Amino acid sequence: MPFASPDLARACADLLARESACDIATLVAAEADASDRSNPDVVKAVLALPEGQTSGRALYFTRSTLYGDGPIWRHVGIYGYRRDALMRFCAAPPSPLEKREKLEQLRALEMGLQIWASVIDEAPLSVDNPADLEAARALA
């Protein structure tokens, strides 16, 4: 994420400080447009996020299309870890769900680690494919 603000790392650190049950902190933003729902390059987060709250526990992440009327949260691939959680995560082999979706955070969920996500206003530009790279070059 070439244009990520340091505030994003701070938001992860704040979430770890605020939520004692949180092993791994990450960020989400509301979907940018309806095409995000079916775009496999956009990782979607399913959250236990009570109405009016700005952070909650992540239940699942997927590249697949999400259906329904609820909000679609676009995952921002920035993480903050508690030391013990990072050590356990790094020592574990890739999990079945991780291999299926090609999403490393699913290994943590399968291990029983809690991932919490804070909502941010807008996802920074991510470079995940050649079109994203061209967009980043145009902004640089």
Where are these regions (language model features)?
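Conserved alpha/beta core of the MobA/IspD/sugar-nucleotide pyrophosphorylase nucleotidyltransferase superfamily
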Residues: 72-140
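A short, conserved beta-strand element in the Rossmann-like catalytic core
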Residues: 1-3, 124
